[in-house]
Structure formats: structure tokens, C-alpha cells
């Protein structure tokens, strides 16, 4: 039996694995609050925890966000298993979002917070993590997919 939406599963696994391995490295290497300038004043690794969503939105809403992460993950898994065969961009987009949602969701359930460490100081951007990056990239891929879909004679998008 061939796995449907294979690229979805590959993207989800890679995103989840890279997120978890980088967070593990940060927790094992840094003290909370410690920073390592890679490009001083521009880009640092800074170990912080976040009880909110991506980029510290909804800070302090851990309980609600852990269930949201689980719900999003279950819906995306159901889509890939029981939905139609998705096009390339949809598979990549949904897969990256699943990997990121699962990565941050595991943190929320196990730790009660998310580990963040990517710190772009040049633009004063909130510290974030690899999962947040994959979720954002996944959304961009879904936008690309939406522009490639054309209406059929019945008015439906293919």
C-alpha cells in the first residue's frame, strides 16, 4: 500500500525533527536567558521560554494553546489520511504546519512553555524557534498553492 500525500508526511517529520533537535541543543547548551551573538547586534541565539503562541502572541495562554496545537495537528493528520491527494505546495505547506504545530505542542504539553532561541535583534523581532519558522513557511506555501488553483467550468477550484 502506498502512502497518500507522501510529501506531506516527509515535510512534517523533517520540520518536527529539526525543531525538537534544535530545542534540545539549546536547553542542553544554554542557561535560561543566555545569549550567543552570531552576528553581534543582528542575530543571536538567546534561550528564552514562551507561554504564548508564535512570536509571543497570546502570552500566558498555555492551556488553551496546548489544545489548539493538538486540534490543528489532528485536523491536518485527518486531511492527509482521509482527504484528497494534495498538490505539491499544499502537501509541503500543510506538512510544515503540522511539524511546527506538533513541535510547539509537545513543548506545551511536556514543559508548559515553548523553547525559543532565534533572536533577530536588528529588526527588534520577538525571539522565536524553528517550529514557528516552519509554520510561517507552510503558510507561504499554502498561499502559493492558492494562486495556482484555477476555477473549473463548475466554479470549483481544482
UniProtKB/Swiss-Prot annotation:
Enzyme Commission code: 3.4.23.36
Domain of life: Bacteria
Presence of the UniProt keyword NADP in the record: no
UniProt pathway annotation: Protein modification; lipoprotein biosynthesis (signal peptide cleavage)
InterPro entries assigned to the protein according to its UniProt record, in alphabetical order: Peptidase_A8 (IPR001872)
Keywords assigned: Aspartyl protease, Cell inner membrane, Cell membrane, Hydrolase, Membrane, Protease, Transmembrane, Transmembrane helix
Chief location: membrane
A GO BP entry: proteolysis
GO molecular function annotation: aspartic-type endopeptidase activity
Membrane topology type: Multi-pass membrane protein
Family the UniProt entry places it in: Belongs to the peptidase A8 family.
Protein name: Lipoprotein signal peptidase
Gene name tied to this protein: lspA
Amino acid at each position: 500500500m502506498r502512502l497518500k500525500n507522501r510529501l506531506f508526511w516527509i515535510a512534517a517529520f523533517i520540520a518536527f525533527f529539526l525543531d525538537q533537535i534544535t530545542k534540545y541543543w539549546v536547553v542542553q547548551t544554554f542557561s535560561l536567558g543566555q545569549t550567543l551573538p552570531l552576528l553581534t547586534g543582528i542575530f543571536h541565539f538567546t534561550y528564552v521560554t514562551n507561554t504564548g503562541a508564535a512570536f509571543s502572541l497570546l502570552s500566558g495562554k498555555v492551556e488553551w494553546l496546548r489544545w489548539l496545537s493538538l486540534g490543528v495537528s489532528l485536523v491536518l493528520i485527518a486531511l492527509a489520511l482521509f482527504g484528497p491527494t494534495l498538490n505539491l505546495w499544499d502537501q509541503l505547506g500543510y506538512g510544515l504546519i503540522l511539524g511546527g504545530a506538533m513541535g510547539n505542542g509537545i513543548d506545551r504539553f511536556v514543559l508548559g512553555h515553548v523553547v525559543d532561541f532565534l533572536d533577530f535583534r536588528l529588526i527588534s523581532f520577538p525571539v522565536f524557534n524553528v517550529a514557528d519558522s516552519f509554520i510561517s513557511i507552510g503558510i507561504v506555501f499554502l498561499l502559493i498553492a492558492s494562486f495556482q488553483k484555477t476555477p473549473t467550468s463548475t466554479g470549483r477550484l481544482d
